[in-house]
């Protein structure tokens, strides 16, 4: 990210220390987020005044989903993940809901996941689905990676099913895995006890 920006702007050499707060190989876009935030940091620290659109242009050169993390907003992505548009829920956003992340000690190879996936033609555009009440998403909003990944790692499917048993309004695998997320209307209890020996995270959106 630094080298890319330095091609067009005069930047001094910098020393950065990255402290990762999320697990790696989790399907959470951690590496892409790191790249995007480096662009944001350089823009802010050195007053480059690039603006979001310009930063997204640079970010898209670094990776398919890097541009998504420039604004950190709920977005609908097309192209290779670099063409973004607002994608709100029926209430305008997901504010007030609770998000749960469960990441077991399983590392899913992104290359392997892409090699085995068979993308399905959606019956309805996901941009329209997310405008519906969240309790309708379960039967209409899918992650095509789940079929091959769950086949190889049935533990992940079990986690998703358990989240629904805990009254998640919606649950899905994140990206190519191996994190499973759940969205709840109320703060769930005993998450760490329910999913022992896993990385767990609960927050309010």
Identify what each model region corresponds to.
Residues 14-27, 169-171:
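Short pre-catalytic strand/loop immediately N-terminal to key active-site residues, enriched for Gly-Thr
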Residues 1-9, 18-23:
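N-terminal lobe of the biotin/lipoate ligase/transferase fold
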Residues 179-184:
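Short beta-strand->loop micro-motif that forms the acidic, two-metal-ion catalytic signature
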């Amino acid at each position: 990210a630094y080298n890319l920006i330095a091609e067009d702007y005069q930047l001094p050499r910098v020393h950065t220390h990255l402290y990762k707060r999320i697990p790696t190989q989790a399907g959470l876009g951690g590496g892409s987020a790191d790249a995007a935030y480096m662009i944001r940091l350089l823009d802010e620290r050195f007053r480059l005044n690039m603006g979001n659109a310009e930063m997204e242009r640079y970010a898209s050169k670094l990776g398919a989903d890097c541009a998504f993390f420039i604004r950190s907003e709920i977005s609908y992505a097309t192209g290779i993940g670099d063409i973004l548009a607002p994608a709100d829920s029926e209430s305008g956003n997901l504010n007030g809901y609770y998000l749960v992340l469960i990441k077991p000690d399983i590392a899913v190879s992104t290359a392997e996941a892409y090699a085995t996936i068979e993308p399905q033609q959606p019956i309805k555009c996901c941009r329209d689905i997310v405008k519906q009440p969240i309790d309708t998403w379960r039967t209409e909003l899918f992650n095509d990676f789940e079929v091959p990944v769950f086949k190889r790692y049935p533990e992940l499917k079990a986690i998703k099913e358990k989240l629904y048993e805990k009254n998640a309004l919606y649950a899905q695998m994140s990206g190519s895995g191996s994190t499973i997320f759940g969205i709840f209307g109320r703060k769930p209890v005993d998450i760490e006890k329910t999913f022992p020996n896993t990385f767990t995270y609960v927050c309010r959106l």
